[in-house]
Structure formats: C-alpha cells, structure tokens
Amino acid sequence: MATYIVSGLCFLLLLLAPVSAAAQGKPPGEGKGKLVISLQDAIKRTLAVSNRIKESRAGVDASLSLKGQADAARWAQIDANLFGGPSTKNELRSDTGIIDSKTTTSDIKVNGVFGRAVIRVVQPLYTFNKIGSFREAASRGVRVSQAAVGQQASEVVLQVKQAYYGALLASDTRAFLKGLLKDVRDSLKTTERRVEAGSAAATLGDVYQLRSFAARIEKGIADAGEGHTIAMDGLRTLMQLEPGVQFKLVDRNLTAAAVALRRVEDYEQTADEIRPEFVQLREGIKAREALVEAAVADRYPIIFAAALADVAGATNRDRSRVPIITDPLMHTQGGFFLGLNWHFDFGITEGRIDEARAEHMQLIYKKDFADLGIPFQVRKAYEEFQTATANIKNTKDAYRNARRWLVTAVANLDLGIGEVVQLTQAFILYIEFRVENFRAIHAQRIALANLDFATGEAVRSFTVQ
C-alpha cells in the first residue's frame, strides 16, 4: 500500500510541475494605487509602453528618412564653394605682341587678398531608372518596417496572454489544493483518533501516509503560489508598473473560451493576408528586386543638366579683357550645359549586382520556408485548441466522478468501514483530474492565443503610429 501511495504522490508532483512553468509568461506598469486590470487592459497598456515596439517604431522613422532621401534624389543638387586668401602681384603686358608678366613664379610678391565663389547646380535628367528603383526600394522598406512593428506587437500580446492566463491557472490550482488540504487534515484527525483509541480500522502506517500526503499537497500549494507570483510579476514588468503599485486581475477564475472556430483553411488564408512576417517578406522581396534593378543601372551613365557660376575678385588684380585668358583670382564666368557621368570599374559594379541578386534570393528562400512553416503553426494551434476543448469536457466528467468517489471514501472512513488506501486513491485521482481540467482550460486559452498570433489577428486593429 505504501508503494502505491509513493507512486501516486510522485505522479501528483509531475502533474503540478507545469503550473509554475505555465505561469512564466513575459512581462508591463505605473504609479500608485490599487488597479483592477482585465486582459484587454493589460494588452493596451503593454502595447502603449513596450520598449520593443518603440524600438520598431524608430525603425519606421529611419525607413521614412531613407525614403525621403531617395525621393529627393530626383531634384537638383547644389554645391557652393566659397574661399579666399592672399593674392600675389601679377601684371600682364604685351609690348611685343606676346602676352607675358612682369612678375615670375620665382619672384612672388603678396600685396593683396582675393575671394572666390563657385556654385554648381546639377539636375539629373535620365538615370536608366536608378533613382526610380531606389525610391521603390525605400517605399517597400517603409512597409517592411511597419510590418516589423506589427510583429513585435503580436509577440507582446502573446506574452501578456501567457502571463495573464498563467496567473489564473496558478491561482485556481492553489485555491483548489488549499480546499483539498482541509479535507486531508480532517481525515488525518479521524485516523489519529482511531489509532489513539486502539481501533483496528486504522494503523500508524495510515497516519504516516496521510501526513505525507498532506505535506505533498502543501508543497503543491507553495509551487502554485510561486507560479502565481512569477506570472503577476511578469505582468507588472510587461506593463512597466512601478514596484509599489498594487493590482489584481478582473477575472477570478480561469474559464474556458466559448469560441466556434472557422475552418482551418480560413485561418491559413488570414495568416497569408495579414501575418506581419508574410507582409515583411512580400514587401522585402519587392524591395530587393528594386535594389537589383538599381545595381544594374550602375552599368549605365547618368545624363544631367547643370548650371555653373564662378566669380572671383582680388584687391591687386585688374580684370582681364583678353578672352583666352582667365585670371583665377579675378574673373566672372558661368553657363548652362548638358552632361553625362559614366563610371567604369573592373568588377566592382558586377559584384554589387551579384550581391543584390543573392540577397534577393535569400528572401525568396525565406518566404518559401514561411509558406510551409506558418500554415503548420496555424494548424498546430488549431488542433491544440480542438484537443484542449475536448479535454475540458473529459476531465470535467472525470474529476466530478472522482469527487463522488472521494466523498464516499471519506464517509466510509468516518463510519469506520473504509480504508485509508481507498481514501488516498480517491484523493490522488481527484487531484489528477481536477488539475488536468485546469490545465486543459489553460491549454485551450493558450492555443487560442497562439492561433491569433499565428494568423496575425492578435494585432489586426493595432496601428503602427
């Protein structure tokens, strides 16, 4: 009999172990006062303060800046150089019909200063779609960054649900075990009285078994309490509540979700349409295609129009009236012209094209993997929900019947016609099926959360801004 009790208690330990682990969802917070928080409250608060989401939003700002740069490449660019310095003496003469100077480079005399301004305006006219490709890539990049915000938000929502439902699971388990502990202690007192009275209906072995069983339940209560503390602290961290803030959950118990699921194919279609990772991949592939086109455009020239103004003046120079002579320190010139800028190298451009094509293929292969992996994730969550829903009903029937057996065993023990081994067996089965029922409800809630995550519906109404 003792062997049976020990094995039963070991099974109970294994049964209760996931309670603490299930409560360890990840973390939100604020000021002072008693807060009563629902699941939706926790989700809204976390989405509002999450640093991971803020980081992703900063990524959107960076992408918008890149898009602004790409768009601005269509317009003229202006370069202005202004400089000045000492001016050397320089006197031209042409007494013999040959233009020369009284001063030479070996006879430098500085007796003045000069200033010069060179302004160049360049307007691209035709770039073989290089600028257009960069603009397309930048525009797609913004959408990729926005989808990344949705991805982070979806993960945050899942973590909040894990912590919230984990706290309820731990709370329900602890409350159940506390109530059961009272029944065990009552049976222990009855058994101890009979042993003291010398009744043949009870032995010291029965007393030791019930004491051991009570201690094991106390450990289960402590484990569930630890799980509840971890889950609540996780919610506090996710919501970024300050340590002094007291809060409790609106829901007092973990209840099954009354949801009629659609066909699994409908959920797969939804995932394909709105799942942030799919959006990222689709937009990312198009962005990479545009970058390949931009790299190919580097093979060809850029045709542009330009305007140039070059003005210089010096205190010790006279303006030259000879058309073929331009004094670099004393002149005024400018004009408009068309130009062509063509860069040549021996392998760099082709290497960049190959690199862009390889990066494009990387995303294509990643999407191929997602096309298989994400639908599997949807189907897995769907099946887990169905299984958990069935288990809720089965374990409910099981623990109710186990409870009836337990009531009968307690009554028989009180009447002196029952055995402790029967009572212990009834306790073990009742604990097993009741905790399994809690776990089935928790599994159903988490499966539904995973399904929302897998399809992208968890953040369907979430906005990037």
Language model: regions and residue ranges:
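Bacterial N-terminal signal peptides
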Residues: 7-17
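A glycine-/polar-enriched beta->alpha junction
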Residues: 44-54, 61-77, 111, 118-137, ...
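Periplasmic alpha-helical coiled-coil/stalk elements that build and connect Gram-negative outer-membrane
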Residues: 3, 37, 155-270, 384, ...
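Bacterial Sec-pathway N-terminal export signals of envelope proteins
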Residues: 23-84, 89, 125, 201-207, ...
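Acidic, low-complexity, intrinsically disordered peripheral segments
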Residues: 11, 20-32, 88, 415, ...
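Small/polar, glycine/serine/threonine/aspartate-rich low-complexity segments that form flexible
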Residues: 25-35, 81-123, 251-261, 293, ...
